[in-house]
Amino acid sequence: AGPTESPAAHPNAPWIIVDIVGTGPNANKLQFIGKESLEVEHTLEVAGRLGHSHFPEYTARGDFFYVSARYRGDRSQGLPGGQLVIYDAHTLKQVKSIDVDVPAGVFSHVRSRSVTVGLQPPVPH
């Protein structure tokens, strides 16, 4: 449905999650690719019709995932700026949301302790 910026996967979760970046009509959606089928099995609208959904990330055990949802809201009229939204990784049901003015980035402390694929180790001197 469009280019992705931050795919997320976890050994204990059934899907690879991809966000859709850009300004098109799918920028508010996440897609769930089955690990066995390698096909899009689910699409989830997170941030409303005019919003963006970014940076999906699984929790350490893979039971949940969270995503930054920006709503393009007009806060002067009481509309939300954005949220960090948490979902059950198996049912895809929303568990919780936390208001955040401009949610963007990776919030997982696990990522900082994991190996980044593609980076070469430093050369010893």
State each model region's role.
Residues 1-125:
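Predominantly soluble domains enriched in secretory-pathway, periplasmic, or organellar proteins
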